[in-house]
């Protein structure tokens, strides 16, 4: 219910108050009262016990729904981060979206760096479930951006059509996209593009604001897999990441269109190296070199990326913690993709398949997007090498099937570098 003071601020009453009290006094009083009203509204749910607020997850199939219990919910429901982010905001996207037909989604997001600590009783088991047993309570995440360690990074281009490596980075001290204010999002954009202006050589390029693009230009970039899609995915909309679109969103790319930075989509930044063909070693070398240079330029301006030794690089979705890295190829495998052993082969190689256009798309002309399923517990070098070895195995299987030969399901890869 609106307070008497709030009602006074409507219609002609507001004008009279401005004239009588003066702008400064009224503004101060209004802001104080508004903060009180917002706090009261946020605390309304506390009038009910946690059991009355517990979400109905009986038909859900995501990691959050599998890990959340009434006792965990009761323990965490009334906690908030320093930025005011709550457990219910973390899990809302998973409550609104029971599951996915092709992949098991996480079902929750973080609103800021502190979310992973304040709500660790839920985030930690979700991370362990999603990341093949990685336990952030006792394990430490390795980082390695030495591209010279990669071997056999050239694919057979009769099968592999394109190669790509991406990651995300978050700027410490600013809320993540689910909780980002307009001012914070604009600050992310400003920090990023100011740093990117310092890139030289083959990394040099320019920034394009989404708000200044035509619809035709946007769609062309989306179709060419350069630009993120419009904010229609349930993850973005239900988690609040589509707010104020397209304000403070954009894409930076070098003049060769092989090194890209997305600004303010699911994460503060997405750093991408890509090119046609099968030279994954060259793509990864450019990725490592560009990422290191971007971080150096960010730090020169007094900022840093969110990182800790338990979780690695901090990003919005727990699925991207650690390296945040997804190394992928578009590969044409018409025979293997129809073999009943295909899914098991991918599982044992720690790979996942998506349609030609990514998540929620189908394979066109038997072309699949194949990438690493893990993000945390292994270094960037390890994950890219897993993709290289795995895709070479898939191509070898395709060639054997073309010759009428049998193929084998490989043994499962050991966890986290264990021998």
Curated annotation (Swiss-Prot):
Residues that the record marks as modified (Phosphotyrosine) are 255
Residues annotated as domain Phosphagen kinase N-terminal: 46-132
Location within or outside the cell: Mitochondrion inner membrane
Q: What class of enzyme is it?
A: transferase
Q: Which residues form the Phosphagen kinase C-terminal domain?
A: 159-401
**What are the binding positions for ATP in this chain?**
162-166, 225, 270, 326, 354-359, 369
Instruction: Name the GO terms of the biological process aspect.
Output: phosphocreatine biosynthetic process
**Superkingdom of source:** Eukaryota
In the UniProt record, the transit peptide is located at: 1-39
Q: Which terms does the record give in the GO molecular function aspect?
A: ATP binding; creatine kinase activity
Its assembly, as annotated, is:
Exists as an octamer composed of four CKMT2 homodimers.
Q: Name it.
A: Creatine kinase S-type, mitochondrial
Q: Report the source organism.
A: Oryctolagus cuniculus
